[in-house]
Every structure is written in structure tokens, then in C-alpha cells.
Amino acid sequence: MAKDISRRSFLKALGGGAVASSALLAACKSDKQDTAKQQEPEKGKMTYRVNPGTKDRVSLLGYGMMRLPDKNAGKDPSTGTGEIEIDQEMVNRQVDYAIEHGVNYFDTSPAYCQGKSERATGIALSRHKRSEYFIATKMSNFSPDTWKREASIEMFENSLKELQVDYIDYLLLHSIGQGQDALGMFNSRYMDNGILDWLVEQKKKGRIRNLGFSYHGDVKIYDMLLKWHDEGRYHWDFVQIELNYLDWNYANEINDRNTCTGRAGAGAWLPLDIRPWCPAVLWYSPWGGWS
């Protein structure tokens, strides 16, 4: 592996969105002994969290594959097609560097990088042992032409193909709560077509190891899915939310729904305290660009 990527340049890429600062608070158990086991390591070493369901030892820093090195970046847009041309060699080098330094959680989606992220991610990761990394990808069926059952199934199968794997470690319903009619969109994407039940079946078959969702938007949908879990209707292994470090103190200045004031469950992080089953993946660059 090329050794000419410095820590400075790697973190610079992080600031540009190529790498997402994340925290996988697996299980979020309140047991003090479990917490003690996950204390900070010695300086310069990666911190890990243990998923109690699968016993995955997941790095506290994850790699977001939403914005990858683009050979066309910086070119005059009027002279090009506007399409991304991923610099696969650079992606490989950055992924190698990340794994070498303890990162083992890689988050992608069929929608990222104009649909090219999963393939680039698969190429980079396939050069490593499957046991060295965890892949998170999503059911990103945003467009109405992907709401049909067959189209959504094809999207999942294509993710496996592009990522060059036969199972997904962490599969998410992508960005629930979007749109003017958030409930209607959720039903169209996952319920009316039976795709959520189909994904549950894929988990039983071992093709999905952890099933969860990422949340952006209407908190009512977020609360609804947590209620389903409590009622035993569906089991969520993890939840992924966007959270900038500034949100801890200033989220209410942006939107009161971001805070834990008013009622339990309203805040992005409060459910982690009251629902110890639920790990969270926090994908927000420290510089503000989210992946």
C-alpha cells in the first residue's frame, strides 16, 4: 500500500466530506460494566463499540462514501457533462489508510456519487479480507419508479453485486421522514409494496445482518418506527441520525424538534438514554458537511 498519505491530508479529505465523522454507539447499554469495557484506548489508537446483537467490534470513526475524489472536480462546469468521474486509485489509497488505522465501518448508498459510490466502495474494499470491514448501505428508493416491489428488490440485489459481497452488515431504510407527506412517502417506499417485510425475510436468510433506518425530517415518522419496535411489530437493530457537534448546545436555535425539551423521544439523542437497545450512527463531518 502506498504510504504517502499523511494524517493531515487524510483529515483534510475528511473535512471535504470524503470521510464522515461518526460514532456507532452500539447497544448504548446502561450497564456500567459494559461502559467500562469501552473506555477510551491509549492515545493514537482507535476506539471501538461492541454491538451486543452481533458482537461486531465497530470503529468509533466511520468512513462515509457520499463524496469521493472526483477527477472532474475544479473543472469549468460549462465545458463538461457535470458527471462525476471517481478517482478509484485515490479511493483505494484512502480506504487502505483508513483500515490500516483502525476504521472498519464504511457507509454508502445506491444514491451516492450519482450512483457510482457502491461500485467504487466495492472495488476498494474487495482488496481486503471480508472480516476486516463492515458495510452499511441503504434502500434508497426515493424515486416513484423505484417504489414498485420489483424495482426495490432489484436495487438491493444490485447493491450486493456492486459491493462484491453476499451479505450486508448494516442495511438502512434511507432517510425516513422526507417530503411534505412524510407518512405517505414512507408507506409508498416501504409498506404498500411489502418491501419492509421482504427485507425482514432477507435478514432471516442471513443476507442482512442488521436492519435499521436513517432519519432526516418529520420526527413523527421517527417516533412511529420506535413505537413499532416497542410493540414488537418490527425490530430495529440500529438507527442512524445526522448530528453536528454544535447541535448538542444549539440545536434548539435551528428547530425545537431537534432538542429533548417538551417530551421524551423528541430529541435526536434522547432515545439513546431511554431505549438502550438502540445504537446510533452519527454521520456529520466536524466541518459541517454531512454524509
Language model features: what each stretch is:
Residues 48, 95, 118, 122, ...:
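Generic structural signal for well-ordered alpha-helices
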